[in-house]
């Protein structure tokens, strides 16, 4: 098990509580245990918000539960689940020291509104910062009552901790487009704060955005399975007040900074226009920095002792969420001051310097900032509408999709 200090340091860097970071750490090892279990590896398909965070976008909100679609409905059985999770817990304890007491596991077998069997589980754990009393729990949602439209994919999860296996942790997960479509359907079904946050954030990632026609095919298939039509904006309007009331309570602890709900709701007309086949606005390239190379590395090579990586992670989060970020910066004249910026990309100059390409919020001027001259970074709660393409999504460890294919082969 990693040291307590590693969790505390990660919490400080991400502006989250140690318990949220610890849960993310344990979730990674729980996924490892599930994916390595012979009876589950090819039968459990990972989906939902935690899937989006762990498999596709590391700058996504931290999520707290594990959702799976099961190929074998017979595995939704209390006796079976208690046995396999006792086995998973033993293996995780032996490999990491994380304690997952078998006697504290709960699996409630229920029927969904369609009369099909489902399971809501709770798995307790003791990690690096957990107390011995009132152990935290991971929630499990298991169903076999779902149509899998696209072939699932094998994905390496994001597990940025020092005890990560050399070979990584690979899981069977929804195709990105299907994960996006199921979130869109959930927004129409439940209109919960996290569903709105998820759909808007997925849409904002222009590089991964599917073509609207094929995406609508997948969404239509997912909706038809539930007896729903293709969602429209008017379906959501009656739920707006409840969504606004729960916005902070549901999301604030999962994010370093939270935008006002209006900045998400106001983007829905554009999203539904895109779904109907409309063309999304095309942003022009930033007027400066084109001669420099865009940096896509998840971990950016920096001089020994440099503070920059933690700053980069916060900048990426802010940019992805369209939040202004406040930087503490020393300019060419040696003057140190703070300023709010819109962050767009990291680039490496011909001299080898790492530059943050941004727009100064005060006057709208494009600027470049030497990363080594940044002494502090703080995401604000002020939103901005991008003027230029945001090129801060890292590539490499995770299966970040790039402009999803224009055609899909729909499954059975």
Report residues per predicted region.
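Short glycine- and basic-residue-enriched patches
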Residues: 279-412
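Glycine-rich beta-strand-to-loop/alpha-helix junction loops that act as flexible
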Residues: 46-50
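Structured mid-to-C-terminal alpha-helical surface segments
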Residues: 1-44, 54-66, 70-304, 309, ...
């Amino acid at each position: 098990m990693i040291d307590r200090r590693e969790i505390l340091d990660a919490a400080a860097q991400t502006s989250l509580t140690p318990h949220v970071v610890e849960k993310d750490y344990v979730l990674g090892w729980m996924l490892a245990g599930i994916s390595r279990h012979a009876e589950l590896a090819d039968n459990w398909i990972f989906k939902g918000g935690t899937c989006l965070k762990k498999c596709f976008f590391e700058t996504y909100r931290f999520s707290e539960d594990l959702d799976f679609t099961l190929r074998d409905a017979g595995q939704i059985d209390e006796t079976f689940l208690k046995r396999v999770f006792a086995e998973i817990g033993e293996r995780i304890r032996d490999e990491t020291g994380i304690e997952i007491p078998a006697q504290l596991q709960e699996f409630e077998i229920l029927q969904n509104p369609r009369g099909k069997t489902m399971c809501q589980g709770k798995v307790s754990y003791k990690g690096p910062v957990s107390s011995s009393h009132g152990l935290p729990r991971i929630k499990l949602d298991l169903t076999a009552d779902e149509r899998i439209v696209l072939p699932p994919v094998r994905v390496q999860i994001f597990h940025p901790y020092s005890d990560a296996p050399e070979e990584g942790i690979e899981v069977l997960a929804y195709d990105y487009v299907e994960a996006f479509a199921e979130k869109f359907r959930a927004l129409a079904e439940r209109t919960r704060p996290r569903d709105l946050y998820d759909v808007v954030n997925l849409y904002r990632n222009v590089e991964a955005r599917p073509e609207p026609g094929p995406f609508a095919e997948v969404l239509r298939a997912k909706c038809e399975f539930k007896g729903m039509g293709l969602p429209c904006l008017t379906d959501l309007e009656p739920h707006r007040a409840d969504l606004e009331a729960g916005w902070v309570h549901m999301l604030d602890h999962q994010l370093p900074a939270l935008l006002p709900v209006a900045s998400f709701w106001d983007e829905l007309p554009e999203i539904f226009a895109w779904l109907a086949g409309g063309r999304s606005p095309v942003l022009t390239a930033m007027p400066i920095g084109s001669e420099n190379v865009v940096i896509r590395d998840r971990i950016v090579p920096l001089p020994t002792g440099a503070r920059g990586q933690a700053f980069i992670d916060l900048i990426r989060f802010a940019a992805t969420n369209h939040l202004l970020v406040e930087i503490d910066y020393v300019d060419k004249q040696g003057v140190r001051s703070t300023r709010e910026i819109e962050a767009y990309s990291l680039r490496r100059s011909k001299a080898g310097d790492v530059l943050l390409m941004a727009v100064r919020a005060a006057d709208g001027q494009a600027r470049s900032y030497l990363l080594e001259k940044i002494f502090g970074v703080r995401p604000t709660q002020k939103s901005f509408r991008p003027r230029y393409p945001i090129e801060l999504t890292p590539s490499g460890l995770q299966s970040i999709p790039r402009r999803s294919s224009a055609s899909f082969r729909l499954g059975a």
